[in-house]
Amino acid sequence: MLRETAPRETRVALTPEGVRTLSTAGLRVVVEAGAGQGAGFADAAYRASGAVVADRATVFERAGIVVWVKPPAYELDSLPLRAGTTLVGFQDPHYRRHEIDRLRARGIESVAFDRVPRDETTTEIDALTTMSRIAGGVGYAEGRRLLSPSRRTGPVRALVLGCGAAGLAAIAAARTFDDEKPTAVGNRLAQRDAAFEAGAGRFVPNRDDNAALLESLATTTPDLVVCTAVHRGSPAPRLLDQKALDLLGPGAVVVDLVAKAGGNCVATVADRTATLPNGVVVTHRSNYPASRPEPASHAYGAAAAAMVLRIARGTADVP
């Protein structure tokens, strides 16, 4: 397991608990020194769980399966990776396609959590869903904090775009603040039950022309909009245009969790918080789960350990 080197990354790919799971299954685990520091896990805890703690070069020399959270910030092409090695983690396949192809030509395979399908057979290895849940809750809380004082004098009124894992978590987060039950916007009526179960007070089935969304904004103006609408591997739909933003009014906040996929909001700029001329604040930052490093590492680590076991047993079947 590698120490994370991506900017502001605090998570770790395996917790000591995950190492113990793999060690108990008969696998030998090598952990890069300091890997768990950002999430609060000391090297001694990994040793106590059965791991060998070593430097980066030793990890690559000894490991047949290498796990990370995010791709390393250094060039893998320059490292002495052995043919037959499998790299497990988020791979950013859209942006790293050429590097992944070069590694494959050397006999090094990349297993991407980004592309694990979401169904009943993949629940234990679906790291993307678990991270999305954390991002939804964090995004709601951070957006709420950015509201103007006048918008926080009473229960906050929120609108959540998208009813996937992140959207449902954002809806549920409203209850922890005793806010109004959010309005949920989805593109399928089948999402309605899940939205209400999470705590939504209203469900708006939106169509491609966004007419239903615009009508909702005009009749029930929210203080906070949390954007989560995206399909895995696809560009995010553009749901908030300038007309929609003008309906929100000064002091409202838009949190766009899907900026990396293009964003749901026309004014979103990745890793930036900006106040628009109309007074609406639009914000995004990379890696919302990293602000909750310990629970995020436990969730990610459980998926990573399960994936490593599947690979070791020859039962993994993901891109």
Model-assigned labels for residue ranges:
Residues L2-G36, R145-C227:
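Glycine-rich phosphate/diphosphate-binding loop of Rossmann-like nucleotide-binding domains
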Residues M1-R102:
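An N-terminal-biased, well-structured beta-alpha scaffold segment characteristic
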Residues V19, D43, I100, Y140, ...:
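Generic hydrophobic/aromatic pocket-lining and core-packing "Φ" positions
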Residues R3-T5, Y74-R157, N287:
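Glycine/serine-rich phosphate-binding loop and adjoining beta1-alpha1 elements at the start
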Residues P93-D119, P235-Y288:
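Rossmann-fold NAD(P)-binding glycine/threonine-rich loop
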Residues G50-A57, V111, R202-D209:
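Short acidic-hydrophobic, aromatic-tinged amphipathic segments that line or gate anion-handling sites
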Residues W68-H94, E215-V254:
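Rossmann-fold NAD(P) dinucleotide-binding segment
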